[in-house]
Amino acid sequence: LHFSAFHFLNTNFNSASSNPNFIGYTAAAGYRNQYRTVPVNYNTASINVNKHGKLKFLNYNLGIQFNSDKAGDVSYSRTEFFIPAAIHYKLLSNNFISFGLSPGIKSFSVDQTKMTFDEQYQNGTYSNVNINGENFSRLSVYIPSSLISLNYTLSKIGKFRNIQLGISRMILLDKNKEWVKNSIPSFNRLNNFLLSIDYILNENNFLRINSLFQKQKVQSNLINGISYIHVLNRNQGITKAIGIGLFYRQKDAIIIQPSFMFDNYELAVSYDVNSNKFKNATNLRGAFEICIRYKLNTFFERLPLKKSCPVFI
């Protein structure tokens, strides 16, 4: 997934990281278009629906998750469908240990009709007949996979609240399928390490600090962020709040994200700029994102326990 999925929904990468105190239903949708950063479009979309319930000795969540990426002039697509589930065991002092499992399937595909090769240009003239390019044994591949997650939530240490430490691994159950002829694509295990902390400034103001580290064979990503959230009003169970977040993906992108929360609705928009291109970039180099989340049948004891869209990038 594109790293924009991190701040859309943290359960994209750790199904056990949902708020263990939350009871009710959630629905979320996010969309990203990188129309200015690169010459071709790069679109990312996510949809998530979850049921959060309570049993005698534990809390749980169960839902469906759909993610889709499409990029480039060949419409290279990556699609994921998962059934995220987690159980949350309550320990002393309202602390939780959580276990998550997200079985699902990934698909990868290209549109060969949109490919062009050097052989199609002869004497300055283009022909769609002379094709001697790559030979695909298939244009798509489907791979079953599963995300295994472990998360520990510490409710309070001094002014720190909702401290989450998480680890997860994405396992591809059949990674040896041939896609390009005589070549097996490298689908390696993806490990995620997650840290999230709320720091209470006063009754109506707090900071949310996040860090996510990804490791896939020799490749790695480090993403750090901090958000300031101000509660505008708490009146008869209706909460209004605004926030501003600043996030940085190591050696790659800087993201600015304002957000607004009203009762059960959360809305976040963001704009990112490729930091490694700052010297040559114009003001138009970046990508626009929008995230909407809705919660139903909920009761929040306090805002910092409530997970919101601008948590992760």
Identify the meaning behind each predicted range.
Residues L1-I313:
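Subset of outer-membrane beta-barrel
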